[in-house]
Amino acid sequence: MKKLLGILVLGLLLSTNAHSACEKEDFIKYVEVKGNCIALFGTKKNEINKKQLIILLHGDHRKRDIGGILPAFVNKIENKDRNVFVIARPGWKVKKRKSDGGDSRGVDRGDNYIFIRDIEPVALAIKKLKEHYNPEELILFGYSGGAALTGVIIGKYSGLIDHAILAGCPCNVPEWRKYRKKGSGWPRSSSPHNLVSNIDKDIKVDILIGKNDKNTHPKFSEQYYDLLKKENIDVTLTSFNGDHSTMWKEPIKIINLIKKAIDS
C-alpha cells in the first residue's frame, strides 16, 4: 500500500512539473525559465550563428503592456548580421504575449527590481537565447527600469553581456526613489550602483542621458558613470537634448543613439 501511495505521489509530482513547463518555448515568441514562459518579440528571420544578438528591455509601464514603441525598434535595428529581441519582463505583455511572474500590484505599489522575482528570470532568458543563437557578441539595451535591470544583470552575471547600453537609468535605486518621492524606498530592489565591482572588465558600456530628464535625473547616470570609470570599465557617457519622454515622442533619436553605440 505504501509503495502504491509513493508511486501515485511521484506520478503527481511529475505531472505537475510537466504541466508547469513552458510548452510554448520556441526561442521566437517564448523562452522557458524555471518552468515559466518569458515572452519575446523579435526579428522574423531568426537564424543561429549571426554575428550579434541584441536584447531590448522596456521600462516600468503602468498598464503592464509595453506597447508598440520598443517593438518598433526591432525592425529599425536589425540587419542580416543581427538577431534582435524585445523581452517582456515578468508580469508584462509584448504584442499580447505575457511573461509569467512579476508583481500583479502594479508600478509604484511595490519593489519593481527584486532580483529573484524580476531580474533573474530576464537574465536566465537572455542566457538561453545566447546559448541558442550563438552570437559572437551579445548586446543588451535597457531604458528606464530596463536600464536598472541591465545594470544589475551585468553586475550579477559577469561575462554574459559583451556590450550594455543604458538609457535614462535610475542607477542608484534608493536615491532615485527618494528623489521621486513616490511609493516606498523599494528596500528589496537590487540597484546597479551596488554591483559595479563585479562587472567583467572586458565589457563595453554606453550610458545615454536626456539633459532635461526629470524622472531618472541625469545625476544618477553620471554617478554610475563615475563608479564604472573607477573600476576601469570601458564606458561612454552621451548626453542628448531631450527628457524621459523622448523614448516615445522622438523614438528615432534613441534608435540612432543605439545604432551609434553599437557601431562605435
State each model region's role.
Residues 88-114:
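Cap/lid segment of the alpha/beta-hydrolase catalytic domain
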Residues 18-51:
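A domain-start/cap signature at the N-terminus of enzymes
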Residues 105-131:
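Alpha/beta-hydrolase active-site loop
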Residues 219-225, 229-264:
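C-terminal catalytic histidine-bearing segment of alpha/beta-hydrolase fold enzymes
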Residues 165-174:
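Active-site nucleophile loop of the alpha/beta-hydrolase fold
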Residues 141-146, 150:
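Gly/Ala-rich beta-loop-alpha elbow adjacent to hydrolase catalytic centers
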